[in-house]
Amino acid sequence: MVLDIDMFRTEKGGNPEIIRKSQQDRFKDPKLVDEVIELDEKWRKERFVADQLNRQKNAISKAIGEKMKKKEPQGTDDSVADDIVARLAELKIDELSQLTVVQLKKLRVLVDEKSVQTAAAVIANENARHEKLIQIGNLIHSSVVVSKDEANNKIERTFGDLSTKKKYSHVDLVVMVDGFDGERGTVVAGGRGYFLKGPLVFLEQAIIQLALQRLNVKGYVPLYTPFFMRKEVMQEVAQLSQFDDELYKVSSKGSEIAGDTSVDEKYLIATSEQPIAAYHRNEWIKETELPIKYAGVSTCFRQEVGSHGRDTRGIFRVHQFEKIEQFVLCSPNDNESWTLFDEMIGNAESYYQELQIPYQVVNIVSGELNNAAAKKFDLEAWFPGSGAYRELVSCSNCLDYQSRRLKVRYGQTKKLSGEVPFVHMLNATMCATTRVICAILENNQTEEGINVPTAIQQWMPENYRTFIPFVKPAPIDEDAKKATGKK
């Protein structure tokens, strides 16, 4: 995930000041821009010398051939003057013609040695430049609020009654319908482990079906993704911080060959956005094939490092969950990606309106954007039992930031020269099932149980078609009784 390097080159029409401003607006170090420019200049100088040396090697070989053809004396002394060696990459043809065959052969050896050194310098500078480049975020859209404080997220619009209060939170409700076992889940899987059971298994499948059916009508192709990604591919779609805070690493045998002791590193996906972004890796996509719309279906795995103490009970924030994701590839022209951005957040809004879940859509402040997003909208549902807004959807336009590193190019033919455009990529949650379950439970609770939203009743079994009864007491009430008893 990177910006176009030409954006840092003024002679190529780039404007580094725009990138510095974007970095400042993200509350990130703008000095990275200057470091990229410095390393790029070093890289270009070494690249120029490497090209010169390559041409010089060909010229020397040609000069040797001509002398051999003319049967000129080859000479016995291969020593070459220091001033010639110093100008190894700049020697002219007439200077080469004055040297003997053995001198030219010595010169060719020196060119080869210098080429190896220069090639190493080219690679070193390119790698150093890349390490700095990937730390610089996408250019922020002008409509993003510049702030580091999430309290300044701009509310774009709302739906439903956002003032209602209800008795129980999702933490209690999942237990009351006997749809969750966290104690056994923790024994089996560790912290935040859980078993989903009974009515909530059916509810989860109904939520998924509604999402897939609605996206299918909109032309989104369902794509069930791998759960693992190779390290080198994951590095092209994930930020460095995600490797430490979010991603699970899995080590296994490098091959199925008996006796092979090599180790293969893979990473569990945190979202289907990651494998789908890489689905067209190293491909050229014709204009007539765009936009390409996918409905990603996957289990997601997240370490949730940094979330210690947050949402430790229930199923709102867990290490493993199911998710339906919108992912779109489109033309980089005519602001098409911004039109699709509106469509994708609109798809999510329609979905939650069908489920009658109240929400607000917020424009995320600049300091809270991930590197890839030029702009991000979150859909935050109102949880009347918790008395809080909770994020259910994130919708991001990443422009060509992801596709550039993945080399997903836009066009019909492979261009040998000139600017190569890349497709734009967008992603938006449709539903992260455990979070949607929590929202449904809190918003549809009654004294006796949970009213099932009309939109998903067709996928529920007869005994839970319209209503899921409470069959266990609320943990919060049980805790209160115990506390009273102790007194």
UniProtKB/Swiss-Prot annotation:
Gene3D superfamilies: Bira Bifunctional Protein, Domain 2, Serine-tRNA synthetase, tRNA binding domain
PROSITE patterns: AA_TRNA_LIGASE_II
Reaction catalysed by this enzyme: tRNA(Ser) + L-serine + ATP = L-seryl-tRNA(Ser) + AMP + diphosphate + H(+); tRNA(Sec) + L-serine + ATP = L-seryl-tRNA(Sec) + AMP + diphosphate + H(+)
Any one of the GO BP annotations: seryl-tRNA aminoacylation
One MF term in the entry's GO annotations: ATP binding
This protein's UniProt keywords: Aminoacyl-tRNA synthetase, ATP-binding, Cytoplasm, Ligase, Nucleotide-binding, Protein biosynthesis
InterPro entries: aa-tRNA-synt_IIb (IPR002314), aa-tRNA-synth_II (IPR006195), aa-tRNA-synth_II/BPL/LPL (IPR045864), Ser-tRNA-ligase_type_1 (IPR002317), Ser-tRNA-synth_1_N (IPR015866), SerRS_1_N_sf (IPR042103), SerRS_core (IPR033729), tRNA-bd_arm (IPR010978)
Location in the cell: Cytoplasm
Annotated residues for binding of L-serine: T271, S272, E273, E325, T429
The protein's annotated pathway: Aminoacyl-tRNA biosynthesis; selenocysteinyl-tRNA(Sec) biosynthesis; L-seryl-tRNA(Sec) from L-serine and tRNA(Sec): step 1/1
Membrane-spanning intervals of the chain: none
Binding site for ATP: R302, Q303, E304, V318, E391, L392, V393, S394
EC number: 6.1.1.11
Gene Ontology cellular component annotations, sorted alphabetically: cytosol
Pfam families: Seryl_tRNA_N, tRNA-synt_2b
Record family assignment: Belongs to the class-II aminoacyl-tRNA synthetase family. Type-1 seryl-tRNA synthetase subfamily.
NCBIfam families according to UniProt: serS (TIGR00414)
Recorded domain comment: Consists of two distinct domains, a catalytic core and a N-terminal extension that is involved in tRNA binding.
Assembly and oligomerization: Homodimer. The tRNA molecule binds across the dimer.
Protein name per Swiss-Prot or TrEMBL: Probable serine--tRNA ligase, cytoplasmic
Gene: sars-1
